[in-house]
Amino acid sequence: MSMDVGVVGLGVMGANLALNIAEKGFKVAVFNRTYSKSEEFMKANASAPFAGNLKAFETMEAFAASLKKPRKALILVQAGAATDSTTEQLKKVFEKGDILVDTGNAHFKDQGRRAQQLEAAGLRFLGMGISGGEEGARKGPAFFPGGTLSVWEEIRPIVEAAAAKADDGRPCVTMNGSGGAGSCVKMYHNSGEYAILQIWGEVFDILRAMGLNNDEVAAVLEDWKSKNFLKSYMLDISIAAARAKDKDGSYLTEHVMDRIGSKGTGLWSAQEALEIGVPAPSLNMAVVSRQFTMYKTERQANASNAPGITQSPGYTLKNKSPSGPEIKQLYDSVCIAIISCYAQMFQCLREMDKVHNFGLNLPATIATFRAGCILQGYLLKPMTEAFEKNPNISNLMCAFQTEIRAGLQNYRDMVALITSKLEVSIPVLSASLNYVTAMFTPTLKYGQLVSLQRDVFGRHGYERVDKDGRESFQWPELQ
């Protein structure tokens, strides 16, 4: 039996992607480190109409021998050491010209390293992130490939068939560029995901602090969803999480430890943004907000050692309906904050493209987020259109200036209310407001003073607005 493509790793993502591809009519060879898992997979799907398109192999040698040449293998194992180990095993059984595709959440620089190592061995490589989770892998995820165009063209028919389709029928995949471009896009996709999930978490915290129960919070979010602007997968899962009940009928949120895990992509994105000098405070604070949660013991000790230090007057809504004035303020705040997060994310990608020469087509990349992935939602369509209309737009927020003008005062008022009346931490909502304010301020006065401060103590010099070059002031000696 000559198989079209191989899948290595039958965890949740690998198993579901293998089923997805097989259902599209391709013959899929599967291999797992433990053959018992492969047997379980085959048994569980023996009655599927496309079961004849699946075949499991006990050894890597048999797996490789089953594949049509040039062989194509999708690697779906844990990023890092497991990926390196799997790659080394495949190198031993694959031949010159064969293709390895790493789909893990890898750092884009690691993908560049793997590509060089494999090319030196005569193999071809593609880094291709996947978004959409278990359901996406099975029904159609978004893919983010990067590497050599000729390699992409060989794997393209399989990937496009398996990908989610947007409303216009276009598959949610595009070749993002050379080297680690695909993994870089996936990194910033995940950083945007971090930030927007955190915004919804902060909204939940705010509304609960204002006296709403979980079902009332969910009702507010349902109303916001009906307005379409915020309609998204992340809003849907926020509503589901708020409504979820434990076995005893109580809200599940009340039994969940407030520690948020992470896989590292958000941190990598924040680090890269800082290194290349792109302001991305919401993406950075989304990482910090998770770090806050990991300090559970310290937070408990602080609250015990200094009781009441964050005590505030409190604020209970008189009108808990979605039409209430404070809820309208919060709605406007969230709309602008999410626009701000996307603006930062895309600005990072634009600058990363300049630094690393990926050859990124940003409108095409954004279009791949419209379905199948965690970021999917209404806003991706007008954002794609904004970049298609003006690829050189100074900042995505300019395309949404009508919404920002209409809601910015409400945003400011809401942040003021939260910080003065509620014991609620809002790291990303506050960072997003600061980003909007800073990026629309032609002259930042603090920039003038701090430039002079640096000249006083370090003779670093400063630029003037009335002539080119740098100069230093003759400062009097300070005691």
UniProtKB/Swiss-Prot annotation:
Keyword Repeat: no
GO molecular function: NADP binding; phosphogluconate dehydrogenase (decarboxylating) activity
Disulfide-bond pairs as recorded: none
Residues involved in NADP(+) binding: G9, L10, G11, V12, M13, G14, N32, R33, T34, V77, Q78, A79, N105
Annotated binding of substrate, by residue: N105, S131, G132, G133, H189, N190, Y194, K263, R290, R454, H460
Catalytic activity reported: 6-phospho-D-gluconate + NADP(+) = D-ribulose 5-phosphate + CO2 + NADPH
Keyword terms: Gluconate utilization, NADP, Oxidoreductase, Pentose shunt
Highest taxon in the source lineage: Eukaryota
Active site per database record: K186 (proton acceptor), E193 (proton donor)
Pfam families: 6PGD, NAD_binding_2
EC number annotated for this UniProt entry: 1.1.1.44
GO biological process: D-gluconate metabolic process; pentose-phosphate shunt
This protein's record includes keyword Oxidoreductase: yes
Family membership: Belongs to the 6-phosphogluconate dehydrogenase family.
Assembly and oligomerization: Homodimer.
Function: Catalyzes the oxidative decarboxylation of 6-phosphogluconate to ribulose 5-phosphate and CO(2), with concomitant reduction of NADP to NADPH.
Record protein name field: 6-phosphogluconate dehydrogenase, decarboxylating
